[in-house]
């Protein structure tokens, strides 16, 4: 549960929330390696553990909602769709390929119909959800928002979309992975569910996989909890502990990485080899002139910047996204970079050398 009267800063909450409270307790939450518990009838898959609870309390306080942890971000996404059981999902046409693949499979099996929209065109999104509601009823429609989008960093008018969806009694899911709980708190705008791949910025060290959901709707929370139980999508004890430890420094890491990304983006926008560049927080996308061949050469030539597919760690990573079948619609020269916390001049020196290749 969250503290609704919590006026502390995010930096303070990240450090203090989710700690043991009793005298002589350890300072940090313990790694509880248990599936079964004496006498009470508790079972970890059903009732959770104190390690999960500590992480969920801390993330819940940052986001302002009730939190549940899952094995991965995709497990969280699957649980949301299981819990909400929509007939139509309105989803950004450019968004995380894992969720789009899941929705595509569900559509192929006749479980859902997917309507793709340009998420920055608020009028078109509202029109799409109203049309879906008129067709199947508001309770069978979900608006799935990803902002900023992966990998193009499009930014939705989040508050306006949440208000419009709520006015039509349509449930809204916000994948806030790129923004993290530091960049935005969609529950404040009336989102029904917020999800994170905690594998990314929350964990922050590229050493775990975990997913998180948050909601202020008691009925939805119970459905999500039920989904976690019946799907068996529970987090590991070590993963929950590492995610909580990563959360302790999230505000500092996010701030430092954002500062670096702002500066790298500023320099890229005037670089002769670059067609376009944009960053939102630590996430930076840019298009290399010369298309796929030139972009691949940049990735191959960089030495300190790591070519890797995930993001949100302390290290700077990048990759050309259009090489993946699910991102075939993306500009072939687009490189998505997750800017880390290294010295900005070292990042720039490596990138500048790669661009000159």
Question: Where do the protein language model's features map onto the residues?
Answer:
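A short, N-terminal amphipathic alpha-helix
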Residues: 58-63, 267
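Conserved C-terminal alpha-helix-loop-beta "cap" of PLP-dependent enzymes
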Residues: 280-335, 339
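Conserved PLP-enzyme active-site core in the AAT-like
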Residues: 2-6, 16, 23, 67-278
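PLP-dependent enzyme catalytic core of the Aspartate aminotransferase-like
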Residues: 8-11, 113-115, 126-135, 168, ...
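Short loop segments at secondary-structure junctions
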Residues: 36-37, 215-220, 247, 287-293
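Short amphipathic alpha-helices in soluble, non-transmembrane regions
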Residues: 224, 296-303, 350-355
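N-terminal "arm"/small-domain region of PLP-dependent enzymes with the aminotransferase-like
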Residues: 1-58
């Amino acid at each position: 549960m969250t503290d609704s009267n919590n006026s502390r800063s995010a930096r303070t909450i990240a450090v203090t929330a989710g700690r043991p409270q009793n005298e002589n307790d350890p300072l940090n939450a313990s790694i509880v390696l248990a599936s079964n518990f004496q006498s009470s009838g508790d079972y970890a898959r059903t009732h959770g553990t104190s390690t999960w609870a500590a992480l969920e309390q801390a993330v819940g306080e940052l986001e302002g909602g009730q939190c549940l942890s899952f094995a991965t971000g995709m497990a969280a996404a699957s649980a949301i769709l299981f819990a909400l059981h929509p007939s139509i999902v309105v989803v950004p046409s450019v968004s995380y390929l894992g969720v789009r693949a899941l929705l595509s499979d569900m559509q192929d099996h006749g479980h859902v119909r997917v309507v793709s929209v340009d998420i920055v065109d608020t009028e078109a999104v509202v029109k799409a959800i109203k049309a879906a509601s008129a067709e199947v009823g508001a309770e069978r429609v979900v608006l799935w928002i990803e902002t900023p989008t992966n990998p193009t960093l499009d930014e939705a008018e989040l508050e306006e979309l949440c208000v419009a969806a709520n006015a039509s009694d349509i449930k809204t899911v916000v994948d806030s992975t790129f923004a993290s709980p530091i960049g935005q708190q969609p529950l404040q705008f009336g989102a029904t569910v917020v999800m994170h791949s905690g594998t990314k910025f929350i964990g922050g060290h590229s050493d775990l996989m975990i997913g998180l959901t948050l909601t202020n709707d008691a009925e939805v929370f119970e459905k999500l909890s039920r989904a976690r139980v019946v799907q068996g999508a529970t987090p590991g004890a070590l993963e929950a502990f590492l995610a909580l430890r990563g959360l302790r420094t999230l505000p500092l890491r996010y701030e430092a990485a954002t500062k670096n990304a702002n500066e790298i983006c500023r320099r890229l926008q005037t670089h002769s080899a670059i067609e376009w560049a944009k960053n939102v927080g630590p996430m930076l996308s840019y298009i290399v002139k010369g298309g796929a061949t030139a972009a691949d050469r940049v990735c191959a030539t960089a030495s300190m910047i790591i070519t890797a597919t995930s993001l949100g760690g302390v290290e700077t990573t990048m990759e050309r996204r259009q090489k993946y079948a699910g991102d075939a619609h993306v500009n072939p020269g687009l490189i998505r970079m997750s800017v880390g916390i290294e010295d900005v001049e070292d990042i720039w020196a490596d990138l500048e050398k790669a661009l000159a290749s």
